[in-house]
């Protein structure tokens, strides 16, 4: 783990996605953070020690999903399945719910972790990540802690490495190159996840805070807001946290009454033509009961 002394920084961004705005000054206290996302090898040690069964390994209870056909009540997870050609981005046609896809079988039955030991663990829910953190004597980061760490001392820069997207024409993280979702040119060498530390560290010596996998935080999702100044109170919030569990729900959206946590960092599926979220300020609302092949996590220790 690497210790960060904390401090005041400008959180958020303007000019990209509305859920990132406004830019606001916040303060975080000192904390330590994992140098990389938790790897398959590390997660395997946790499972061996505790017998933990992940969310994706448990068949859904039909009572929790009214109207679901019984034949679909099988364990599994969402796997990226690139289409042969262009598709409507709103269709999300590149995702397949694959029975038997788990952290140990990331592409479904017949796949293994051979050669992926030092890749980030995926197909883990928020509860799986929190269970690992508790076992390790750690915690999941807040959104503010994650963004502070991801910025690596570059105050106000668009990217974790500066304001130039690809310095010298070289990818600085594992993200999608080419037309998404059907034409990855593999300029960074990876179609899916990559081994941690495959790309240069940021200014704090941290790896993979941008790209590779989205990472769970422990904050409920909400749109940012600026607190009104109150007499006798400092105008810079300290250690801000997200919304309430209830407020994180998008009752009119596809996730319905399922609470949502904030994901940070972007992933190998973020593309300039589709999802420019390979930036410290980027954020995404992920239902806590949804697991995919591009979401992982890392841990912090506060104080």
Residue ranges and their predicted role:
Residues 34:
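An anion-binding catalytic pocket shared by soluble metabolic enzymes
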Residues 39:
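Acidic-aromatic/histidine active-site loop/patch
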Residues 3-4, 10, 15, 59-280:
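Functional-site microenvironments in short loops/helix caps that host divalent-cation chemistry
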Residues 293-303:
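Short, structured beta-strand segments at or near domain termini in extracellular proteins/domains
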Residues 31, 46-55, 136:
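Short capping motifs at secondary-structure boundaries
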Residues 25-31:
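A short N-terminal beta-strand-loop micro-motif at the entrance of redox/enzyme domains
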Residues 26, 45, 57, 114-115:
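Zinc-dependent metalloendopeptidases
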Residues 18-21:
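C-terminal, low-complexity/hydrophilic appendages and adjacent surface loops
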